[in-house]
């Protein structure tokens, strides 16, 4: 899976499942999940679960705190690395 596809799917999760924006067009790759999108700790756990299910990868609780979930771009890099 290409990074663009991963990035687009993550943005879709943020809009369709977590309701953090009205449209994927409102979310830039550099958007900070906590600061810019207002995600709280429960949202981070929900996103980690969704990412694991959608991409078929293991996401540990420590991955959230290790900085992989700070922005859309960082999360895209994390998922891409786990897929390859």
Identify the role of each PLM range.
Residues 2-39, 49, 53-84:
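Phosphopantetheine-dependent thiolation modules in NRPS/PKS and related acyl-activating systems
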Residues 43:
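Two-component histidine kinase catalytic core, primarily the HATPase_c
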């Amino acid at each position: 899976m290409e990074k663009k596809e991963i990035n687009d799917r993550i943005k879709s999760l943020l809009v369709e499942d977590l309701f953090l924006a009205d449209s994927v067009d409102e979310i830039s790759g550099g958007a900070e999940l906590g600061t810019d999108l207002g995600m709280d700790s429960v949202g981070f756990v929900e996103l980690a679960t969704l990412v694991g299910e959608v991409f078929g990868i293991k996401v540990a609780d420590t991955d959230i705190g290790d900085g992989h979930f700070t922005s859309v771009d960082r999360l895209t890099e994390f998922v891409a690395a786990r897929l390859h």
